């Protein structure tokens, strides 16, 4: 299997349903625009879902876990063993995203793409093993071409499953010690930014730790300066879980499934996906603005206005999950409010 599928055409939102939803908003018992962005969200969901009555009840959350060779450079406040330990925590339902998924009634898929501290086969975890970790991006490309292909395909596999369940919204998350370093390096390469602009605290680095992280990213960018395409930059600087998110976002857009993007790492993947296949951008909604330093720059590059700003920086799809009730409220208001005619209320 080649990577040619990632360049395939994306679905097109339904303009007729968008117009119908806009017309309904104009007839609801409220001043025009009084519900602000909630109105826009309902209209956008109607166009995506090709219905006058959008809903966000069937939600698929996929969390991709993978380790990074660059962790050997000491770029995280936590040891690399944590990635595998968190996979086990996801499976047991103790992680933040597991709690949120239960609260939302969402389907949670956990995918083990390769971790150093491998917990082995676990119930509720899909094993899509590639390698124990990527290579150290300061020494060589993160992935081989085959590994990149497999990681992209792992994300697409999630979408195939989600589509089979008539999913109304896809949310992607990640777990991997060292992945903010990979995401920052990738963002720098794509946006021609200096590492100081995108490198942040990650799991909790102090100022000295962030300065070291900047040095590590600078070394990686120098080594891979000849990478000229988004796909090659992803292969050299990214991670298995970042590539899986890229594959999921592209496959979702091709399948016509709306995507709610999480934080810094997920947005880096969204930027790659949109550069590889520009049609993807039309299917992306952004859940929150992370506290991670580089997230704002990535959002600007995507012309994205996130729904929330709560100073979150956990990852796991947790910030996006917190935004889902907003989407549900938008749909409930759109579908449930009376029109002026139904309520016998005078229009303006």
From Swiss-Prot:
Pathway: Nucleoside biosynthesis; alpha-ribazole biosynthesis; alpha-ribazole from 5,6-dimethylbenzimidazole: step 1/2. It comes from the Bacteria. GO terms for molecular function: nicotinate-nucleotide-dimethylbenzimidazole phosphoribosyltransferase activity. SUPFAM superfamilies: Nicotinate mononucleotide:5,6-dimethylbenzimidazole phosphoribosyltransferase (CobT). CDD domains: DMB-PRT_CobT. It catalyses: 5,6-dimethylbenzimidazole + nicotinate beta-D-ribonucleotide = alpha-ribazole 5'-phosphate + nicotinate + H(+). InterPro entries: Nict_dMeBzImd_PRibTrfase, Nict_dMeBzImd_PRibTrfase_bact, Nict_dMeBzImd_PRibTrfase_N, Nict_dMeBzImd_PRibTrfase_sf. Keywords: Cobalamin biosynthesis, Glycosyltransferase, Transferase. Its EC number is 2.4.2.21. The active site is at 316 (proton acceptor). It is an enzyme of class 2 (transferase). Pfam families: DBI_PRT. GO terms for biological process: cobalamin biosynthetic process. Belongs to the CobT family. HAMAP family: CobT. Catalyzes the synthesis of alpha-ribazole-5'-phosphate from nicotinate mononucleotide (NAMN) and 5,6-dimethylbenzimidazole (DMB). PANTHER family: NICOTINATE-NUCLEOTIDE--DIMETHYLBENZIMIDAZOLE PHOSPHORIBOSYLTRANSFERASE. This is Nicotinate-nucleotide--dimethylbenzimidazole phosphoribosyltransferase. It comes from Xanthomonas oryzae pv. oryzae (strain MAFF 311018). The lineage of its organism: Bacteria, Pseudomonadati, Pseudomonadota, Gammaproteobacteria, Lysobacterales.
């Amino acid at each position: 299997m080649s990577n040619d599928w990632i360049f395939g055409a994306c679905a097109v939102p339904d303009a007729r349903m968008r117009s119908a939803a806009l017309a309904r908003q104009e007839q609801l018992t409220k001043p025009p625009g009084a519900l602000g962005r909630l109105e826009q969200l309902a209209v956008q969901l109607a166009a995506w879902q090709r219905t006058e009555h959008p809903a966000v009840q069937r939600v698929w959350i996929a969390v991709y876990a993978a380790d990074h060779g660059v962790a050997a450079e000491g770029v995280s406040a936590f040891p690399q063993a944590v990635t595998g330990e968190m996979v086990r925590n996801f499976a047991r339902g103790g992680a933040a995203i597991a709690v949120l998924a239960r609260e939302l009634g969402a389907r949670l898929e956990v995918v083990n793409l390769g971790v150093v501290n491998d917990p082995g086969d676990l119930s509720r975890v899909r094993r899509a093993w590639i390698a124990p970790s990527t290579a150290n991006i300061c020494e060589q490309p993160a992935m081989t071409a085959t590994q990149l292909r497999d990681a992209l395909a792992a994300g697409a596999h999630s979408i195939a499953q989600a589509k089979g369940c008539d999913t109304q919204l896809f949310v992607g998350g990640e777990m991997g010690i060292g992945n903010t370093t990979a995401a920052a390096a990738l963002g720098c390469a794509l946006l021609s930014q200096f590492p100081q602009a995108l490198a942040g605290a990650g799991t909790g680095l102090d100022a000295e730790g962030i300065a070291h992280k900047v040095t590590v990213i600078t070394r990686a960018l120098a080594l891979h300066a000849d990478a000229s395409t988004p796909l090659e930059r992803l292969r050299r600087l990214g991670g298995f879980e970042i590539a899986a998110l890229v594959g999921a976002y592209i496959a979702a857009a091709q399948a016509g499934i709306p995507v709610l993007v999480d934080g810094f790492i997920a947005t880096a993947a969204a930027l790659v996906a949109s550069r590889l296949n520009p049609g993807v951008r039309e299917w992306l909604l952004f859940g929150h603005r992370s506290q991670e330093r580089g997230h704002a720059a990535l959002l600007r590059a995507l012309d994205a206005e996130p729904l929330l700003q709560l100073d979150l920086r956990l990852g796991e799809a947790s910030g996006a999950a917190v935004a889902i009730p907003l989407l549900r409220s938008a749909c409930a208001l759109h579908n449930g409010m009376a029109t002026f005619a139904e309520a016998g209320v005078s229009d303006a």
